[in-house]
Amino acid sequence: MEKESSLPLETVSHVDLNRYMGVWYEIARYPNSFQKGCVGSRAPYKLLDDGKVSVLNECYDGSFSGQLRSAKGKAWIVDKETNSKLKVSFFWFFAGDYWIIDIADDYSYVVVGHPKRKYLWILSRNKTMEDDTFAGILKRLTEIHHYDTSKLIKTIQQ
């Protein structure tokens, strides 16, 4: 069987950037070093005049009474035909892939992945997500995108 990360990762056919802007709440993610201990994770996105996107990732450290951590960055479109492949940079010397692989028709949720499947985020416009919606996303992640969903950790929201 082919290694998961060697299979091509498909993105959505089109993203309307204006509809994508606003606040997204993290529902679940793959564990990563830069969000260790995060609860209440959210990210407001704002389209800038130059076509780039302002990103502000925020979370509380350890608990909702913990310190608010934030990282400000910028994103830019890599695939202008679909707007589904972006690069995001929080530090001037490093930019990471941000690929939109699933999105609700009404933009109520989005799934963001990485071409080598190192990272994964399930985001919602609300702090919670219906169980059947979440289950449908997990099914598509496994069957279509070849992600190991057992690695996902649910994000505590208040």
Residue spans of the language-model regions?
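A beta-rich soluble binding module of mature secreted/lumenal proteins
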Residues: 1-158
